[in-house]
């Protein structure tokens, strides 16, 4: 008995169904007779079937839960689009009019906009989880897929992972094995759940690979594919452009400051001390901060000399960080970009899920300690910074490896 995967039209459109080919069974001697799982005969020309088998597309669904996810999956979307054996369905958990998705984002990344939007909008993590589970389940009712790829550690990511696994669909986690080892963090819970459910654990570095290998279930596989963010940076580096709002900015003469972490923003007394230490240590070196929302409002109210500007496009922000004297951030992605660019970076946290940026790269952790921040900024301004290198597999071929694994 031989099995082939063919496309068969039914009431829901074109779907994939397993058919069984019987050669010399009872009174059936024709090699062109096939039977569906329900026993009905299906006649297909054998040559046509061989072609379908050879060129059968695998449908890969990528779910993005927030703006940073698109930056990571853009090379994967392009890689799948170039492969005749795969088809990509890009889904966004949010709304089509999400203000964080600036009009230029998808053009900057040279990727298509999502074909589907789940329309979820809430500030409650538990509500996001439940809404995404319901919406994604309905989406899969109407759109059969072979594998679902989820990214990072958001509530929407975890929700989609649960729905995928309950449906028996293959699940892949991009940037698996990252840990803070703080179970009180919602994102840490998300990571643990997603990794435990995933069939494919795609890791970025040696440390995350070790964690994934230790924790993986017997039915999952870990692949150290590399850092997908580096694919995006390498693809776009020559396309970075100077921000139009900063025409006179001199390369290497400024510090970039980003702020997003809610806990850090909420403690305004300590944040005020940190901002004061940062600006005093920087001296005449300007600190440029492309901030939005609550972070912008809070820093403005504290009345510092930080130069707050409007949020930048992806290509403009890439130029700003690549040509900075240094970067101060609470973002893991920004610290990775700084290491790639060889730019000194200070992370406002006691830990990082991207340990390679500290052990090999240009990143230093100062926590939320104003005096540690003051000391680190002084070293940054004076040029007294450690030497750094690129971690293993930051070579821009991560998306290529992932597609090869999924289609093997």
Give the ranges of each region predicted by the language model:
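Short terminal hydrophobic/aromatic SLiMs and anchors at protein ends
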Residues: 4, 22, 29-32
């Amino acid at each position: 008995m031989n099995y082939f995967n063919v496309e068969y039209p039914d009431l829901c459109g074109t779907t994939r169904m397993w058919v069984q080919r019987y050669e010399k069974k009872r009174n059936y001697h024709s090699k062109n007779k096939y039977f569906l799982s329900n026993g009905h005969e299906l006649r297909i020309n054998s040559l046509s079937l061989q072609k379908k088998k050879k060129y059968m597309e695998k449908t890969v669904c990528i779910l993005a839960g927030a703006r940073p996810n698109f930056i990571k999956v853009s090379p994967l979307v392009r890689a799948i689009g170039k492969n005749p054996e795969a088809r990509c369905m890009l889904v966004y958990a949010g709304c089509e009019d999400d203000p964080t998705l600036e009009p230029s984002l998808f053009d900057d990344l040279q990727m298509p906009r999502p074909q589907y939007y789940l329309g979820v909008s809430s500030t409650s993590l538990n509500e996001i989880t439940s809404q995404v589970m319901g919406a994604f389940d309905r989406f899969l009712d109407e759109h059969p897929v072979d594998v679902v790829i989820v990214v990072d550690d958001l509530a929407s990511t975890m929700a989609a992972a649960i729905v995928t696994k309950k449906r028996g669909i293959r699940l892949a986690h991009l940037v698996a094995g990252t840990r803070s080892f703080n179970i009180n963090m919602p994102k840490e819970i998300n990571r643990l759940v997603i990794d435990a459910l995933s069939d494919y654990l795609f890791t970025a570095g040696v440390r995350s690979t070790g964690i994934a290998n230790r924790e993986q279930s017997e039915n999952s596989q870990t692949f150290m594919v590399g850092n997908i963010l580096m694919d995006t940076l390498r693809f776009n580096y020559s396309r970075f452009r100077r921000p139009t709002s900063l025409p006179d900015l001199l390369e290497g003469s400024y510090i970039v400051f980003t702020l997003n972490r809610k806990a850090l923003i909420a403690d305004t007394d300590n944040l005020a001390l940190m901002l004061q230490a940062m600006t005093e240590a920087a001296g005449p070196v300007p600190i440029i901060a492309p901030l939005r929302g609550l972070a912008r409002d809070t820093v403005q109210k504290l009345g510092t000399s930080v130069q707050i500007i409007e949020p930048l496009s992806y290509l403009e922000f890439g130029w700003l960080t690549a040509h900075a004297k240094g970067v101060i951030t609470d973002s893991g992605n920004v610290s990775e970009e700084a290491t790639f660019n060889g730019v000194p970076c200070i992370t406002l946290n006691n830990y990082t899920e991207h340990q390679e940026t500290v052990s090999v790269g240009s990143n230093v952790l100062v926590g939320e300690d104003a005096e540690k921040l003051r000391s680190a900024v002084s070293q940054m301004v004076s040029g007294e910074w450690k030497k750094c290198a690129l971690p293993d597999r930051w070579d821009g071929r991560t998306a290529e490896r992932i597609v090869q694994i999924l289609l093997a």
